[in-house]
Amino acid sequence: MPITKIHARQIYDSRGNPTVEVDLFTEKGVFRAAVPSGASTGVHEALELRDGDKAVHLGKGVLKAVSNINEKIAPALIAKGFDVTAQKDIDDFMMALDGSENKGNLGANAILGVSLAVAKAGAVHKGLPLYKYIAELAGTGKVVLPVPAFNVINGGSHAGNKLAMQEFMILPVGASSFAEAMRMGSEVYHHLKAEIKKRYGLDATAVGDEGGFAPNIQDNKEGLDLLNTAIDKAGYTGKISIGMDVAASEFFKDGKYDLDFKNPASDSSKWLSGEQLTELYQSFIKEYPVVSIEDAFDQDDWDNWGKFHGATSIQLVGDDLTVTNPKRIQTAIDKKSCNCLLLKVNQIGSVTESIEAAKLSRANGWGVMVSHRSGETEDTFIADLVVGLATGQIKTGAPCRSERLAKYNQLLRIEEELGADAVYAGHNFRNPQV
């Protein structure tokens, strides 16, 4: 069934910045998708097209991307008469229409908006829930409910505190279902709030971009200690593991790592070498139930990535390192730099390429963690994506803020719909199909 109309508009994300929304029309109705955007972005990401007029939205308007959809992509796609279920053909056509390596002409945010809407329409035309349609597109065997990695303490570029490392996450690996994982996450979150209030005062319980708390602490171990205490008070010691997103590219300076990077008068004699930072991570792993570290080093510090990967058995996630880009992923595979892909649909800019990135990673023994961005919308596509790709893990913020809960609540609905067929990844989150 062909696409009859495509209309894009500028809406706002969870940080109050403009973003792209697309309505795609077929005989069966209207299918809507909204595009997220990140705060800490890798230099190798596909290009998010912004207007650049500093007098309007501080340069962050997306009317160029909207116009590219309405005036270029829409007429070209409709003229071709593609069936809405031809996801790969449509995505390939849009990439050819753009003609650049990084989607810089039309904008990755323009192409992705249409790509997401096409997938939603394709599912309805096939008479399938979106997660089952994605599983069909990807050739997935059995669908799997993911372990949620709740980002409950925010630092780095996501918060105004002194904490250098960006995300401190809890993973309810010992839950028996996604619903139980949500309960665990929610309870720990509330115990954490009470503990932060007790230690640092009520004003320390304000939340960051992704719903996590941002107490004004500087020592990263203090963050881990807070998590351990909250997990213990909730009664889940041994059932909940810890994950971190260090976002080290944000504080990489002159070949070293500055854990006081938010201080303009930071003492360069205290900056850490890659080796010293590795030692710090090893101490985290030894002292706390840390099972996953993301972006442990700068996005081009291949040497330290490789050394750490060779010296640890935990999950090492590439985000800024790999930017969901098959070429970067292949380089990381060849260099043995990490063992898990952070999959962000807007880093690569289409559904087809997202599926291909996940398949390439899995074929080489990696895990895959599906991820939101810090600037999110109420769109729930990634909830269906993580189930359809059966990757076993998702991070989409704390159990707080509606744009985060929208995804978690969709996962609850999917688990309910699957009934007795629902499988929760649990301890097998790194390789749920084994």
Swiss-Prot record:
Mg(2+) is required for catalysis and for stabilizing the dimer. This is Enolase. Homodimer. Pathway: Carbohydrate degradation; glycolysis; pyruvate from D-glyceraldehyde 3-phosphate: step 4/5. It comes from Caenorhabditis elegans. It catalyses: (2R)-2-phosphoglycerate = phosphoenolpyruvate + H2O. The gene is enol-1. Disulfide bonds: none annotated. Belongs to the enolase family. The lineage of its organism: Eukaryota, Metazoa, Ecdysozoa, Nematoda, Chromadorea.
